[in-house]
């Protein structure tokens, strides 16, 4: 069994360099919610050094709230903003001898494209326009995954080690109780259940079906690195290979 392990980087966390030794894919902030040209260059350089797949992490234009504010923008605006961000990272990667492999939206853009078909279409269209060979990463079973498949893109369905799930397979909003799993044992058990058995227990107790092709690790938690190391160790014990 194989699984991709990804992390969002270039967002101001001190653990970026160490996380890049543990993950197989890096989603690099492109300036709209965090990061800038220099952090993008630095993250690309470290990803290449560690053999980690380079990906863009585009966002709504919302540095004030770290890309977590809901926005109702025209799809054409979202298309242009996404193309701008992923195009910048693709060029930075190419300039350093690397290749951008995937795109994963950030924050509220990620959440809204999971449910809003027009927004999902705008993202998928931008990714296709940039490079049809790019992999589009989105929430398992989401509108974004459906849109990517409609454009003929390779898609990668994502699950979260430390997020609570609702009965329909969507994430519990961060503003609600149960959104974040802070117990390491619970997060580890949830991850293995999703990867090995394709299901997750919702906060209301029902099982939701999920397709786990990549697992997101958040690097901003207090015990993020320790959990990442433990997850890698557990995967090795279960003969689950970590690779992009």
Curated annotation (Swiss-Prot):
The keyword Nucleotide-binding applies. It comes from the Bacteria. InterPro entries: Glyco_hydro/deAcase_b/a-brl, LamB/YcsF/PxpA-like. Its EC number is 3.5.2.9. Keywords: ATP-binding, Hydrolase, Nucleotide-binding. It catalyses: 5-oxo-L-proline + ATP + 2 H2O = L-glutamate + ADP + phosphate + H(+). It is an enzyme of class 3 (hydrolase). GO terms for biological process: carbohydrate metabolic process. One of its GO terms (molecular function) is 5-oxoprolinase (ATP-hydrolyzing) activity. Signal peptide: none annotated. Pfam families: LamB_YcsF. The keyword Nucleotide-binding applies. PANTHER family: 5-OXOPROLINASE SUBUNIT A, UNCHARACTERIZED PROTEIN YBGL-RELATED. Belongs to the LamB/PxpA family. Forms a complex composed of PxpA, PxpB and PxpC. Catalyzes the cleavage of 5-oxoproline to form L-glutamate coupled to the hydrolysis of ATP to ADP and inorganic phosphate. This is 5-oxoprolinase subunit A. It comes from Shigella boydii serotype 18 (strain CDC 3083-94 / BS512).
């Amino acid at each position: 069994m194989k699984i991709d392990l990804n992390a969002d980087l270039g967002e101001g966390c001190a653990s970026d360099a160490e996380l890049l030794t543990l993950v197989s894919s890096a989603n690099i902030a492109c300036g709209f919610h965090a990061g800038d040209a220099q952090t993008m260059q630095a993250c690309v350089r470290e990803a290449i050094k560690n053999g980690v797949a380079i990906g863009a992490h585009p966002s709504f234009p919302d540095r004030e709230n770290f890309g977590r504010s809901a926005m109702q923008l025209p799809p054409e605006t979202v298309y242009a903003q996404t193309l701008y961000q992923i195009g910048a990272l693709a060029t930075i990667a190419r300039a350093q001898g690397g290749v951008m492999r995937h795109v994963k939206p950030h924050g509220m853009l990620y959440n809204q494209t999971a449910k809003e078909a027009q927004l999902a279409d705008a993202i998928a269209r931008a990714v296709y326009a940039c490079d049809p060979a790019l992999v589009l990463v989105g929430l398992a079973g989401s509108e974004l995954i459906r849109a990517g498949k409609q454009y003929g893109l390779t898609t990668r369905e994502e699950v979260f080690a430390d997020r609570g799930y609702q009965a329909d397979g969507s994430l519990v909003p961060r503003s609600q109780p149960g959104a974040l799993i802070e117990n390491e044992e619970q997060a580890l058990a949830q991850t293995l259940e999703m990867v090995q058995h394709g299901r997750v227990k919702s906060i209301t107790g029902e099982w939701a079906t999920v397709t786990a092709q990549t697992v997101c690790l958040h690097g901003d938690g207090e015990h993020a690195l320790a959990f990442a190391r433990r997850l890698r160790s557990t995967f090795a014990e279960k003969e689950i290979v970590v690779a992009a």
